[in-house]
Amino acid sequence: EATGEPYRQAVGGMSAGNGSLMCLAPVAMAFCDDPDAAAQFSADSSRTTHPAVECVEACGVYGRLIAAAIEGASRTELYVLAADLAEQMTNPDLATILRGSYRVKGRDEISSSGYVLHSLEAALWAFASTDDFLEGALLAVNLGDDADTVGAIYGQLAGALYGRSGIPENWRDRLHDTGMIEDLAAGIADRVGTFEVVVG
């Protein structure tokens, strides 16, 4: 039955899945010139399907990190930004992750389950543990469990940092509809700064 509410009602806890965190790149790309908008619209994109507080906050902060990487932030600058954003989080576990707790953990301390904070931590761990796209992607997906989603979450930030040329050409060429994907990305890039959000 319709409630008239534009967003789903939050449930939270371990039912807070990672689905909205894996598909932020287009939003972050569209608003990469406006960090606050990138964060806000990334968070809003989660509310439609994954309204738990930790999902919404994780999407907001990750969208902002992706946007910063697109705009040229270094790895170190991304770590500093994440730590700064941790102060705005209401979820203490998310704040701990953003402060870099994953950077001192070993493989056996990382969970790659479907829970949004586990997946975020796993993706950031793979990102911090390697210095090129391929190695990090392999590390992320070989954690097991929800491997494809963790790989996608990793790939958004790593792709933004390393750029198109940092992704192995033979991987790009083997994607289904590579041309369509690149055309869509180019279309978003060409329109940065022109997107208008219509509510209602």
Regions found by a protein language model. Give the residues of each.
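Amphipathic alpha-helical interface segments
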Residues: 1-130, 136-143, 157
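Phosphate-handling active-site elements
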Residues: 32-38, 132-135, 162-175
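Conserved catalytic/binding loops enriched for acidic/polar residues
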Residues: 148
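Short, small-residue alpha-helix embedded
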Residues: 151-162
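Conserved glycine-rich phosphate/nucleotide-binding loop
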Residues: 160-200
